[in-house]
A protein has these predicted regions:
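Alpha/beta enzyme core
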Residues: 35-37, 90-104, 108-118, 129-213
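Active-site beta-loop-alpha junctions enriched in small/polar residues
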Residues: 18-20, 50-52, 82-84, 109-111, ...
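Conserved phosphate-coordination/catalytic loops
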Residues: 83, 125, 129, 193, ...
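Hydrophobic faces of well-ordered beta-strands that scaffold small-molecule active sites
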Residues: 13-16, 45-47, 77-81, 104, ...
């Protein structure tokens, strides 16, 4: 039986799992403004990453449950979990699988010290044997739930240094349907440019394994336009977009610039003229952008007001409110707000000017 990965149109595009960013409120906006019939088989959503250990006790599960809520409009959607305890990963993934996700992804790339010190996230890169056991435990949990959903892994090219030839083959020995590679080491964080040239070597390793595993590249992707060019140039099956989606819930359904425009201007020197770059945030009229920001704020307050600080929304405000006259002053006022009603007042006052 085919899993959802095998039914995707190529190239496909993935929403990166980002803590306090890709929550149900932001994914709701991305689904509403970014998904449609034409691209539904080309866009995959990820949840925020969730602690398997936390899901294994009653209090923790209650506290984390909002991170695993999703709507049908978001499908296909993958739940990402992290942990270094096989028993807890099995138990947690049995629960996660029962919620109806299309797949489960294991985080083996987060460089945060609090995660790495547990042996989880990028800490797995230093312990390939445990990493393989964790993949097996996740499959066991899914089976215990009576489900048949695929398992994928998101990782990096190495820990302190590039270790593709030793680390990636260990993952390929296990039953994974897709492999997402953040093209930096854990030590590099996001401080250096992602090395997309590594994709070729990883593709060769997958081919050598004899398995049908999809390869997803991640790192420094500006938008869908940039993602398509990277797929064409490097040959990956899909691309994951992280920071490029901030403040741009329209991103996944944007048109792309012509090949000639792209080659002439390049991703790093765009002037974002609407006719040239229909995928840019600037292609959206300012009033609409601010109204969608307000809608996002209201939905956040409705769905997550009891679970998260309102300050979480302020990183979104910084992204929505950028690149136009008066943006700085508007951001300052938005940073002082404490609820959606206050945001509405600030936005309305600005639009009256």
């Amino acid at each position: 039986m085919q899993n959802f990965w095998q039914k995707l149109d190529k190239p496909f595009f993935c929403l990166a799992p980002m803590s306090d960013v890709t929550d149900i409120a932001f994914r709701h906006m991305l689904a509403k403004y970014g998904k449609n019939r034409e691209n539904r088989n080309k866009v995959v959503f990820w949840t925020e990453f969730v602690s398997a250990d936390g899901l294994c006790n009653k209090l923790g599960r209650k506290k984390l449950s909002h991170m695993l809520e999703f709507s049908e409009s978001e499908r296909p959607i993958v739940a990402q979990v992290f942990g270094a305890n096989g028993d807890n990963m099995k138990k947690a993934c049995q629960y996660v699988a029962s919620l109806g996700f299309d797949g489960i992804d294991i985080n083996m790339g987060c460089p945060d010290k609090s995660v790495v010190n547990q042996g989880a996230g990028a800490g797995m890169i230093k312990n390939p044997k445990l990493a393989r056991e964790i993949i097996q435990a996740v499959h066991a949990g899914i089976k215990s739930a009576g489900c048949h959903i695929p398992v994928s892994v998101k990782t990096r090219t190495g820990f302190n240094k590039e270790g593709i030839d030793t680390w990636i083959p260990e993952l390929l020995k296990e039953d994974i349907s897709a492999l997402t590679i953040h093209l930096r080491t854990a030590k590099e964080l996001s401080l250096v440019p992602a090395n997309w040239d590594h994709i070729k070597k990883i593709k060769e390793l997958i081919k050598k394994s004899g398995k049908d595993i999809l390869l997803i590249g991640n790192g420094d992707v500006v938008d869908i336009d940039d993602a398509k060019r990277k797929c064409e140039k490097y040959g990956c099956d899909g691309v994951m977009i992280g920071r490029g989606v901030f403040g741009n819930p329209w991103l996944f359904r944007r048109g792309v610039a012509s090949k000639e425009t792209w080659e002439r201007d390049g991703a790093s020197t765009r002037n974002f003229l609407v006719k040239k770059y229909p995928c840019s945030l600037e292609a959206t009229p300012l009033k609409e952008r601010l109204q969608v920001m307000l809608e996002h704020t209201r939905f956040f307050e409705k769905m997550l007001g009891k679970h998260k600080s309102f300050d979480v929304m302020k990183k979104h405000f910084k992204a929505y409110v950028n690149g136009f006259e008066g943006a700085k002053e508007l951001r300052v006022k938005l940073m002082e707000t404490e609820n959606a009603e206050q945001v509405e007042d600030v936005v309305n006052d600005f639009l009256k000017l």
